[in-house]
UniProtKB/Swiss-Prot annotation:
One of its GO terms (molecular function) is translation initiation factor activity. Belongs to the eIF-3 subunit M family. Component of the eukaryotic translation initiation factor 3 (eIF-3) complex, which is involved in protein synthesis of a specialized repertoire of mRNAs and, together with other initiation factors, stimulates binding of mRNA and methionyl-tRNAi to the 40S ribosome. The eIF-3 complex specifically targets and initiates translation of a subset of mRNAs involved in cell proliferation. GO terms for cellular component: eukaryotic 43S preinitiation complex; eukaryotic 48S preinitiation complex; eukaryotic translation initiation factor 3 complex, eIF3m. It comes from Aspergillus terreus (strain NIH 2624 / FGSC A1156). One of its GO terms (biological process) is formation of cytoplasmic translation initiation complex. Residues 431-444 have a biased composition (Basic and acidic residues). Its main location: cytoplasm. InterPro entries: COPS7/eIF3m, eIF3m, eIF3m_C_helix, PCI_dom. Pfam families: eIF3m_C_helix, PCI. Residues 205-376 form the PCI domain. Residues 42-61, 422-461 are annotated as: Disordered. This is Eukaryotic translation initiation factor 3 subunit M. Component of the eukaryotic translation initiation factor 3 (eIF-3) complex.
Length: 461
């Protein structure tokens, strides 16, 4: 898989290595005329330049490489243990060309084909060689585009889920950077996205496949939106999104010029998109009754009839939850909107929660769903009116709460003042009582004490 930069360490001059590679090709082909003999007149001037340390003739090298690369198709028949080293030698030689890209794209096309000498391990060998090529190129080199295409093609043809899983993190983290660095045009970017989508689909990753189909759709210029190729891609993206169980946001599709062009070329399919974008199960069932799925765009959606109806139920419940002012949905209301038995309501609510469309709590005791959060499928004038209504309700509630808080605050202050006043009066009352007692004691005359003599006399008696 693509990784940090790699350097191939191969000893020898260009002429020596080219002659050695030609001998190897002759050994594999076992036919006449000899490639080595054909290259000898071209290699001799290069050999002399190398010996004299003169500047090599790049045009002469390119002529040699043209013959070597043309004959390299035979490498896919080489013994399994020799394939990697043989291709590495060829890649090393190609890096001496005036424009390596004109040769690397052809080498990549060879590696995208089956390696007949190793049916079992051929894809792994090809991916290993292509990864080496990719990593020997500078990060900004547009030649990497052809190499990545070949890697993705090998993975798709071999249906190697493990190989795709190894490549997937690189695609997620690096692909936008690569595309910007390579400066691809719309056609090249579209081709790469579709190749990745095909590989992801072969590996069973429907979500990533859908993502890259939509990205491929976004590369179509507005001027080309009505062309057959654009129409085919728009139909593919739309049918994939409608039938995919995890795709509920259709905004990227409705924003595409190619999808908008379906309003003319495939009006019933576009009408179905509008229903899934903003309408409910009632509208969907009425549409299907009047326009069977088998009659829409060649019947591409007919096999997904059950999946479409199930998705429409989830979307309907999301719309119902989003438009309920009280944030409480009785089971009976849900059952009626979804056309399901009352005993199945909780199952559908749970499925909608798992899809990330709503959040809330089921109350079996009260037979209702308490909505905490709901996803708006579209957000227009109606939704703004709903938001305004809810904000007004919250405002009135907050005003009531604020009134209660103010009343309680005033009561608290009043009671504190009264308590403080009472405490002060009580303190003043106690102080007055103490002063009166002291005054009373001062005003009372002191009792005379008996004379000592009298006391003594009494004691004597």
């Amino acid at each position: 898989m693509p990784a940090p930069s790699t350097t191939l360490l191969i000893e020898g001059s260009f002429s020596e290595l080219a002659d050695e590679f030609a001998q190897y090709i002759d050994a594999l082909r076992k036919t006449e005329p000899s490639l080595q003999a054909e290259l000898s007149p071209l290699l001799e001037p290069l050999r002399q330049q190398e010996q004299s340390d003169a500047e090599p003739d790049r045009k002469q090298r390119d002529e040699v490489l043209k013959k070597l690369v043309s004959a390299a198709t035979v490498l896919n028949t080489a013994p399994e243990k020799e394939i990697i080293s043989a291709y590495n030698l060829l890649v090393h030689l190609v890096h001496h060309a005036s424009d390596p890209d004109m040769f690397l794209s052809r080498i990549c096309s060879y590696l995208a084909k089956p390696i007949t000498s190793s049916p079992q391990f051929g894809p792994s060998l090809a991916i290993s060689i292509l990864s080496t090529i990719f990593n020997t190129l500078p990060a900004t080199d547009s030649s990497r585009y052809h190499v990545l295409l070949a890697i993705v093609a090998v993975i798709r043809q071999s249906a190697q889920g493990v190989a795709f899983e190894a490549l997937k993190p690189q695609l997620t983290a690096q692909l936008p950077t690569w595309l910007a660095a390579w400066e691809l045009d719309e056609d090249e970017a579209q081709r790469l996205h579709l190749a990745i989508a095909d590989a992801a689909q072969a590996a069973g990753d429907q979500e990533l496949a859908q993502t890259h189909v939509v990205q491929a759709l976004q590369t179509i210029p507005a001027a080309d939106a009505s062309k057959k190729e654009a129409r085919d891609l728009a139909v593919r993206a739309l049918t994939s999104a409608l039938s995919h169980p995890a795709v509920f946001d259709f905004t990227p599709l409705t924003a595409s010029d190619a999808v908008q062009a379906l309003r003319t070329s495939d009006s019933t399919l576009f009408e179905l998109l509008e229903i899934f974008t903003a309408d409910t199960l009632d509208a969907y069932e009425a549409f299907v009754a009047a326009t069977p799925l088998a009659s829409i765009s060649g019947g591409v959606l007919a096999p997904a009839a059950d999946a479409l109806q199930n998705k429409m139920r989830l979307l309907t419940l999301a719309s119902l939850a989003a438009s309920t002012p009280s944030r409480s949905l009785p089971y009976a209301t849900i059952a009626s909107a979804l056309r399901v038995p009352a005993e199945d309501v909780e199952k559908w609510v749970i499925d909608t929660i798992r899809a990330g469309l709503v959040e809330g709590k089921l109350s079996q005791l009260r037979s209702e769903f308490l909505v905490h959060r709901a996803t708006y499928r579209v957000f227009g004038e109606k939704q703004w009116a709903e938001v305004q209504g809810r904000l007004m309700v919250w405002r009135r509630s907050l005003e009531n709460v604020l009134g209660v808080v103010r009343s309680e605050r005033e009561r608290f202050i009043r009671e504190n003042l009264q308590a403080a006043q009472a405490a002060e009066e009580a303190a003043q009352g106690k102080s007055g009582d103490k002063k009166g007692d002291r005054r009373q004691r001062r005003d009372q005359p002191q009792q005379s004490q008996p004379a000592p003599e009298a006391a003594t006399a009494v004691a004597a008696e």
